[in-house]
From Swiss-Prot:
It comes from the Bacteria. One of its GO terms (molecular function) is mannose-1-phosphate guanylyltransferase (GTP) activity. Homodimer. Its EC number is 2.7.7.13. GO terms for biological process: GDP-mannose biosynthetic process; O antigen biosynthetic process. It is an enzyme of class 2 (transferase). Pathway: Nucleotide-sugar biosynthesis; GDP-alpha-D-mannose biosynthesis; GDP-alpha-D-mannose from alpha-D-mannose 1-phosphate (GTP route): step 1/1; Bacterial outer membrane biogenesis; LPS O-antigen biosynthesis. The lineage of its organism: Bacteria, Pseudomonadati, Pseudomonadota, Gammaproteobacteria, Enterobacterales. This is Mannose-1-phosphate guanylyltransferase RfbM.
């Protein structure tokens, strides 16, 4: 029997700041090796008989998801865009409704996974999923309980009930994150598992329980899916209908109340990578138990996580620290207090600082840009456009733009004119002028963009689809 993977990719990963940002959260990061967490989540399904994955994500991340799927040779036409966040119960309901509408299998088994988890033992993972198959096929709602390796206060727990089959249990209860003493008792008892947030069930089984236990969520999602707007690779859900949907997790909405919940134990080196300390736990270490990534010299140091993006970092005689350097931010924290990193993100949000939103180097489907300098009434960016790529015609009311080509050749549309701009040449785009840019060449186009004007906000962009032969595919992705 085949599975339909449903990958939940909507989180923000704020506890892994400054690497994880709102516009580029942790599920799109490569924490070990070259592949991102999202890509690894999908690749580990290779030994299972699965259909092309359904990915549920924030509208803002749609092109990141599509690009990362294409990089691992997966179809990118099953991406469900949540117009607003409503937690996991509605998100899974959207996938279940879509699966019943579109799947060749009339009632597929949905394998629901988070995009930002790490599983080190893929054989054990596959074995647990296969073991759960018979229960899910017969109408049970299966969750996977991680066998604890220690007393942990950072996870919720599942208490197992009666044995209903070989290494399969009824769910007795879901338990919130405990204090350290209670976590110790759970660990000693052997009856509690970490709540992984991974599930296996038939689409109809989930929707039937949702309809019975949380009818408002069911009705709102049913209506939202009834007004789907296909958009290239993306499945756009009706915003007004979905906004009326209550926000609730699958645990609260369904799993804690259903009579059909089953827990399958799993020992697979699982981590939700919810903090820098948990990332240190799963990373390869040197003989002093340091994790060193980048250009780093460490002497008489132990138990540290040190990451450098583009600077030389030297450390002497320090222990139990997390040091993370990016182009625009530096984090120094005790490994025992890294859960408080979210307070930094909250501070940045309150003060409307860009460091919580995105990196200085920002990747787009057409290429990337890097902010070089900014100040009152000006912004300077270095832009790289991939061969054959383009961004659509647009206009700004309050700013002008100067483009200076460093390498390659640009095809520029300005008003009714279309012309080529070559290396060491420049062009000027006045305010209120329709303009577009394309790289017609075989090599990357690199240029400097200087924005100047009284207002440089990203909401001063009027995009004009289908103008000057430019497709609408990259609309909203220029900025």
């Amino acid at each position: 029997m085949s599975f339909l993977p449903v990958i939940m990719a909507g989180g923000t990963g704020s506890r892994l700041w400054p690497l994880s940002r709102e516009y580029h959260p942790k599920q799109f990061l490569s924490v070990e090796g070259k592949l991102s967490m999202l890509q690894n989540t999908i690749k580990r399904l290779a030994s299972l008989s699965t259909e092309e994955p359904v990915v549920i994500c924030n509208d803002r991340h749609r092109f990141l998801v599509a690009e990362q799927l294409r990089e691992i040779d997966k179809l990118a036409n099953n991406i469900i865009l949540e117009p607003v966040g409503r937690n996991t119960a509605p998100a899974i309901a959207l996938a279940a409704f879509c699966a019943l509408q579109n799947a060749d299998n009339a009632d597929p088994l949905l394998l629901v996974l988070a995009a930002d988890h790490v599983i080190q033992d893929e054989i054990a993972f596959t074995k647990a999923v296969r073991h759960a198959e018979e229960y899910a096929a017969n109408g049970k709602l299966v969750t996977f309980g991680i066998v604890p390796t220690h007393a942990e206060t950072g996870y919720g727990y599942i208490r197992r009930g009666e044995l209903i089959g070989n290494d399969a249990y009824a769910v007795a209860e879901f338990v919130e994150k405990p204090d350290i003493d209670t976590a110790g008792d759970y660990f000693k008892s052997g009856k509690y598992y970490w709540n992984s947030g991974m599930f296996l069930f038939r689409a109809s089984s989930y929707l039937n329980e949702l309809k019975y236990l949380s009818p408002e969520i069911y009705k709102a999602c049913e209506k939202a899916v009834g007004h789907i707007n296909p958009d290239l690779d993306f499945i756009r859900i009706d915003k007004e209908e979905f906004m009326s949907c209550p926000s609730d997790s699958i645990d609260y909405a369904v799993m804690e109340h259903t009579q059909h919940a089953v827990v399958i134990p799993m020992s697979a080196g699982w981590s939700d990578v919810g903090s820098w300390s948990s990332l240190w736990d799963i990373s390869n270490k040197d003989h002093q138990r340091n994790v060193l990534k980048g250009d780093i010299f460490a002497h008489a140091c132990n138990d540290n996580y040190i990451y450098s993006e583009d600077m030389f970092i030297s450390a002497i005689g320090v222990s139990n620290l997390v040091i993370v350097q990016t182009t625009d931010a530096l984090l120094v924290a005790n490994k025992d207090t890294v859960q408080d990193v979210k307070k930094i993100v909250d501070y940045l949000k309150r003060n409307d600082r860009n460091e919580y939103k995105q990196h200085q180097e920002v990747f787009r489907p057409w290429g990337k840009y890097n902010v070089i300098d900014s100040g009152k009434n000006y912004l300077v960016r270095c832009i790289t456009v991939k061969p054959g790529e383009k961004f659509v015609a647009q206009m700004h009311h309050h700013r002008a733009e100067h483009w200076i080509v460093l390498s390659g050749t640009a095809r520029v549309t300005k008003g009714e004119q279309t012309y080529m701009v070559s290396e060491n040449e420049s062009t000027f785009i006045p305010p209120n002028t329709i303009h577009a840019l394309e790289n017609p060449g075989m090599t990357p186009l690199k240029l400097i963009e200087i924005q100047s004007g009284t207002y440089l906000g990203e909401d001063d962009i009027i995009r004009l689809e289908q103008r000057s032969g430019f497709s609408k595919e990259w609309t909203n992705e220029r900025s």
